[in-house]
């Protein structure tokens, strides 16, 4: 279909700028350009893919992190707070400024290659469910909408928590 493409937004879409655009094999290239220009005009950051990638890039990276995070929790190697602090005060701060590949350029690609060759651990292999997630869900801790997940949200309503998140994201975007 020449007038068909995928536009995939991220949550919350009224704050997060990334929009994945993926054309079908028969999509008119002019349509892809029109949509890219449209998203730029409304302040979004469209990322155009030559073809559909199952899960898109950001979701695939997030899924890989999720596997590692749940492995750390399942094995009792780290707490939710330690993991989130490692992300917020290290990984995410650098990635927000440079992304992943530019950060690698700053580290040095030779060092990156040596790190890959001499890795002291193996990334987790998807094996189904996480025992940590199973326990949380069985105890009614499904995340913000249920009042608790990895963290306890102290009786705050979901709308209060989403508002706090949104204000924080807007503050980060404005700096």
Where are these regions (language model features)?
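A general alpha-helix detector
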Residues: 17-18, 65-69, 111-118
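NAD(P)-dependent Rossmann-like dehydrogenase/reductase catalytic/cofactor-binding core
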Residues: 33, 40-51, 75, 80-175
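Short secondary-structure transition/capping segments
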Residues: 59-61, 156-157
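Flexible helical/loop "lid" subdomain adjacent to adenine-nucleotide binding pockets
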Residues: 61-77
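Rossmann-fold dinucleotide-binding core
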Residues: 1-51, 55-59
